[in-house]
Swiss-Prot record:
Protein family (similarity comment): Belongs to the DtdA deacylase family.
Quaternary structure annotation from Swiss-Prot or TrEMBL: Monomer.
PANTHER family: D-AMINOACYL-TRNA DEACYLASE
Named cofactor requirement(s): Zn(2+)
Gene Ontology terms, MF aspect: D-aminoacyl-tRNA deacylase activity; zinc ion binding
Any Pfam family matching the protein: tRNA_deacylase
Organism for this UniProt entry: Aeropyrum pernix (strain ATCC 700893 / DSM 11879 / JCM 9820 / NBRC 100138 / K1)
Name this polypeptide is given: D-aminoacyl-tRNA deacylase
Region (Disordered): 81-100
Annotated InterPro entries: Deacylase_DtdA_archaea (IPR018033), DtdA (IPR007508)
Top-level taxonomic group: Archaea
Cofactor comment: Binds 2 Zn(2+) ions per subunit.
Length: 279
């Protein structure tokens, strides 16, 4: 499988991790569409772009039109300042598209790749010593880009300027990407693709399942999206917009959603052909 890694050259976390990955893989400098720096290692293209990561809407064509999926390396920002290594899919479950993408549009998820990245981040953080101070977690689906037709998964380092410029953080992301690419084929063969509903932004129950169960989780639609008017169509797309096929299970955090909200998920899941499992 051909994969691509993209980052913003204006983002110290993404740029640092992307260049660390190129060094780790002994990637050769090359040129690729739209990028200001580009490296090639076998079937993997690693490229930096002069735009924000949340606005990389050109990923179908760049950096590798033949890539099946794209991993975006990026900084993570949180007002709490919590040190974290996160994985999530892009998409705007509600009308709010202030951070790129189209309103009420989800990108294509890749549950197996997200699982491979999260497991690999946990492993890499232990190897680099960051596990003691950094939390490895999924995030709910949020921000752009939303228009690429190929799947996009974000792997992020946060949450302060100090963290974004931490070389150990860059190394951790780079090691995780290398490991995820190696383990992806087996994970994809064995895992059950799912979508998540409910929970907070950091979806702790879904994170635990991603790390420890046979499920691989793509889009996660948090409780606050329901409170802000998520539509039935978006809920259905959280299941359907998944590579290589729709999610087979909707994992619903029961206590975090009100009864009408749970019914919305049940109806959307039935229409999309997914089984509902409460967690």
């Amino acid at each position: 499988m051909r994969l691509a890694v993209a980052y913003s050259t204006g983002d110290p976390a993404g740029r640092g991790a992307g260049r660390a990955l190129a060094r780790l893989l002994s990637a050769e400098p090359t040129s690729c569409p739209g990028a200001v720096e580009c490296f090639k290692a076998g079937y993997l293209t690693i490229a930096g772009f002069p735009v924000e990561a949340v606005r990389l809407e050109m990923l179908d064509e760049a950096p590798d039109p033949q890539a099946s999926a794209v991993i975006v390396l990026s900084k993570h920002r949180a007002e709490s300042g919590r040190k974290s290594l996160t994985v999530h899919h892009p998409g705007n479950p509600t009308e709010d598209n202030s951070l790129g993408g189209r309103p009420m549009e989800l990108a294509v998820a890749y549950p197996a790749l997200a699982k491979a990245l999260l497991i690999s981040l946990a492993k890499a953080s232990r190897e680099t010593g960051l596990a003691e101070s950094y939390e490895v977690t999924l995030e709910a689906t949020h921000h752009g880009p939303t228009t690429p037709s190929k799947p996009v998964v974000f792997a992020e380092l946060g949450s302060t300027e100090e963290d974004w410029r931490n070389p150990l953080g860059w190394e951790t992301l780079a090691l995780a990407v290398e490991e995820a690419i190696k383990t992806l084929p087996q994970i994809e063969r064995e895992c059950i693709p799912a979508a998540g509903f409910g929970g907070t932004h950091y979806v702790p129950k879904h994170t635990r399942l991603q790390l420890e169960s046979g499920y691989c989780i793509g889009h996660t639609i948090p409780r606050y999206a329901f409170d802000r008017g998520v539509t039935a169509e978006v809920l259905k797309n959280a299941i359907l917009k998944s590579y290589p096929g729709p999610a087979r299970v909707a994992l619903v955090e029961k206590k975090s959603l009100k009864s009408p909200q749970r019914r919305m998920v049940e109806e959307a899941s039935e229409e999309a052909g997914a089984k509902v499992e409460y967690i």
